[in-house]
């Protein structure tokens, strides 16, 4: 009985997320995705991509403490959910 109780306590500690951490995509394609664990205080995911370019545009994804500002000819999408920056 003690062994079962100890096992349950260990499993609970391992599985319990004591602090919430945002998960953002740092790379994404239809074939794969790379997830970034954001540091404390970085509660937003973002995606930057060029305006008006239709072929093979570059895309920058990551975590941010605040939403990045849009630049000339660059769109910025910002969101506050896990892996929302597809």
UniProtKB/Swiss-Prot annotation:
SUPFAM superfamilies: Snake toxin-like. Residues 1-21 form the signal peptide. Expressed by the venom gland. Pfam families: Toxin_cobra-type. Its main location: secreted. Disulfide bonds join 24-45, 38-63, 67-78, 79-84. Belongs to the three-finger toxin family. Short-chain subfamily. Orphan group I sub-subfamily. GO terms for molecular function: toxin activity. The keyword Nucleotide-binding does not apply. It comes from Naja atra. This is Neurotoxin-like protein NTL2.
């Amino acid at each position: 009985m003690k062994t079962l109780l100890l096992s349950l306590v260990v499993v609970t500690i391992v599985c319990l997320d004591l602090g919430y951490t945002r998960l953002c995509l740092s790379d994404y394609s239809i074939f794969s995705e790379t997830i970034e664990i954001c540091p404390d205080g970085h509660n937003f995911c973002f995606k930057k991509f060029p305006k008006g370019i239709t072929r093979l545009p570059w895309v920058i994804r990551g975590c941010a403490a605040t939403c990045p500002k849009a630049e000339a000819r660059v769109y910025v999408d910002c969101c506050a959910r896990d892996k929302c920056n597809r």
